[in-house]
Design a protein with these regions (language model features):
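Substrate/ligand-engaging "lid" and interaction regions
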Residues: 1-43, 47-537
Length: 537
């Protein structure tokens, strides 16, 4: 069996015999209607889109709650369209990885068409422009990763490709933000038609990031005489163009060899992953965890699909922000970082294996339930306690989720402030006793100990990339693992760094506790495990 329209229609019984759910709607009719009256375009045609956003479209189509599908575009890696979309008739075999090790399979057909957003191809460019002139278009959504919204480098200067787009104008844009601006200009010229422009990537205030990038490019075009003055007013008028904020949460790892083998063993052809020239790792199937959350600011000037019927939460901007803070400061991200520091020290390479370690599980539970929940931001639409329960009991232990603590340890200096400092600030604001905090100082001491690049057995390891790695390691100079007396107060200056930690720990009793924990972590083989056991009894 090969993933194709012909196969799922003519050999439906064979697919179903292998436990694969099939679409319940007329795919050809949906595609015809989408071509005539497009409603939803998506930029970023990778795995999170195919397995999550594409499945939302399928839910609505299956239930008769939508008549059109999504037009999926890739703005970065055109091989994905040729080798995955076109090769498989724009179908995806979605495999959900259940915590008990079982899987659920479904063919997703919610994508009507796969396009290349390639403005050097006249036909592709005109097809996109025609879609954006359609009065029926309601939404352009994105899953392009956080860096896709960046039009400036780390030094603050414009990326050369963006500078080139600003000078050349909207005819042949190359950067995804320039392409977005060009298509919105097309819509403006077609009668200032309304629509929503929706970032769905996992970054704080994503709608604001998207809006600022598009506006900066548009303003350059106006200044260079390449677009009308009214274009800026159009982009800033929320009754015309909105940039809703969102919170997304779903882990969609690379295609897993075990999943590929199980599909091949069941007679599915063409499931081997490919790696494109741009290093996209992708296959005809997507594997992902079952839990998923999408919270969206309900600001859609031209209407929207009934996605609330597919499990999407719609609310105001403040609730989106609160849901994101709940996840990032309490219910998921702090747990990930704390367990990854000690996971690396204890030699783990899989998060699911860490969840079999009683000492690490005690750290995770203390951090989330005992220290985090009392000051959690409660968005009301999602229960923080239920969210943590799912993380601890289902998501982190899932043996099919091949997540690695070394990946999570990347860029920790950019994360310790939001993931731990905000909870400390909440304790201070509420007048709560900071001496009650054990897991947070353990996590921070664990990070400093991790930066010494020696595990709990005294073996060297490679510290994950981090923009402040060299700076912090240089300030830890002179500290020697297996020699607690080598600590001479080197942490004090670091703990006062409010820009990194979001709080000056030297003005709190926690600095002393972090230093005490750190010294104990220098005591030789087994000291990390002993510290966890002693403090989390």
């Amino acid at each position: 069996m090969k993933l194709s329209l012909e196969s799922i229609i003519n050999d439906a019984a064979a697919w179903q015999a292998k436990g694969v759910a099939l679409p319940k709607f007329d795919i050809a009719a949906m595609r015809k209607r989408t071509a005539e009256t497009p409603q939803w375009v998506h930029f970023g045609a990778g795995n999170i889109f195919r397995g999550f956003i594409g499945s939302l479209s399928q839910r609505l189509l299956d239930a008769g709650l939508a008549e059109t599908g999504i037009i999926a575009c890739d703005t970065f890696d055109f091989e994905v369209i040729d080798k995955i979309y076109t090769a498989n008739d724009s179908l995806t075999l979605n495999v959900l990885l259940n915590p008990d090790g079982t899987t659920s399979r479904e063919v997703l057909a919610g994508v009507a068409e796969g396009l290349k957003a390639d403005f050097s191809d006249c036909a592709a460019a005109e097809r996109l422009r025609a879609i954006f002139r359609a009065p029926s278009l309601q939404m352009l959504s994105f899953t392009i990763t956080e860096k896709g919204y960046a039009i400036r480098g780390t030094d603050g200067s414009l990326l050369p490709v963006v500078q080139s787009d600003m000078t050349a104008g909207p005819q042949a844009p190359r950067h995804v933000m320039s392409i977005t601006a060009a298509l919105l200009l097309e819509r403006f010229r077609a009668g200032a038609l309304p629509m929503a422009v929706v970032a769905m990537d996992n970054c704080s205030h994503n709608g604001e990031k998207l809006m600022k990038a598009v506006l900066e490019i548009a303003e350059a075009w106006v200044a260079n005489g390449l677009a009308d003055e009214g274009f800026i007013a159009y982009l800033k008028d929320e009754s015309k163009i909105s940039f809703p904020w969102t919170m997304i949460d779903k882990i969609t790892p690379r295609p897993h060899p075990r999943v590929e083998k199980s599909l091949a063993d069941d007679g599915f052809e063409g499931m081997a992953p490919i790696v494109t020239d741009k290093k996209t790792f992708i296959a005809a199937f997507v594997n992902a965890e079952k839990p998923q959350y999408l919270v969206v600011e309900d600001k859609f000037p031209n209407g929207r699909p009934a996605l609330e019927k597919a499990g999407v939460y719609f609310c105001d901007r403040e609730t989106v922000n609160m849901t994101e803070r709940m996840k990032v400061t309490t219910c998921l991200n702090p747990l990930h970082t704390a367990m990854s520091m000690y996971g690396c020290l204890l030699g783990y390479t899989l998060i699911c294996d860490e969840m079999k370690d009683e000492d690490i599980v005690n750290l995770v539970k203390r951090l989330g339930y005992v220290e985090g929940l009392p000051v959690v931001v409660d968005p009301k639409i999602v229960s923080p306690k239920a969210f943590i329960d799912e993380v601890v009991n289902d998501r982190l232990p899932n043996p099919f989720m091949p997540d690695d603590p070394r990946r999570i340890a990347t860029d920790t200096s950019q994360k310790v402030g939001i993931r731990f400092g905000e909870t400390v600030k909440s304790y201070i604001a509420a007048g709560k006793d900071l001496n009650d905090l054990v897991a947070i100082p353990l996590a921070i001491a664990g990070w400093f100990r991790y930066l010494l690049a020696v595990n709990d057995n005294g073996e060297a390891f490679e510290v994950s990339p981090d923009p402040l790695k060299e700076e912090f390691q240089s300030k830890l100079a002179g500290i020697v693992w297996n020699d607690p007396s080598s600590y001479k107060g080197q942490l004090s200056a670091l703990l006062a760094n409010e820009s990194v930690f979001h709080v000056d720990y030297t003005k709190t009793p926690l600095a002393k506790r972090i230093e005490e924990y750190f010294v104990k972590l220098l005591a030789g083989p087994g000291s990390a495990r002993k510290l966890l056991q002693d403090e989390l009894k």
